[in-house]
Amino acid sequence: KIRKIVFTGGAAKGGNITPAAEFNIYADPEAAKIVFDSGIPLIMCGLDATLKCNLTRNQIMKLCQSGDPAARACGDMAGYVLENFSKYRCVASIHAAVPFMYLIHPEFFKTEKVFLDVECSDGAGRGATLCDFRWWLHEEDEMKDMILTDADTESFQQELFEAIYSVSECKNMK
């Protein structure tokens, strides 16, 4: 039995592919709707938190210049994100790491209980994640979903760096 699903995607306060929708949910809102309606408790790691889970240009350069192969590879990938997807090219958000970081260090994040849904109709709202914070409108067991609303950037960065450098340490232990 699946106890919960922790996923990267969605946004409570506006999207990145349209004003309303975040890319992952927008790409297939019907599939997201199936998951959202599954009854399995969801933890949404959306843009509200993932945009705060980033690396700075200087941190990325440090990774790229490292003698550690894992660090260099991570630096190259983050550098690609910085140059191609970061409008002002000062930070690169590391969206995909957030669910893992949340599972290991939930204390790095603020959360809020919500009722999640997704807009599947055509039009400007297609793919928008609907986060209903109005607990008084739902039965207690309906408010099973949570969203990450904020993140401790500094703690995220420090732990991510430690994890990246520990990859080579683990390899050397064999």
Regions found by a protein language model. Name each.
Residues K1-K52, R57-N58:
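Active-site histidine-anchored catalytic micro-motif
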Residues Y26-D28, C45-K174:
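Conformational coupling and interaction surfaces
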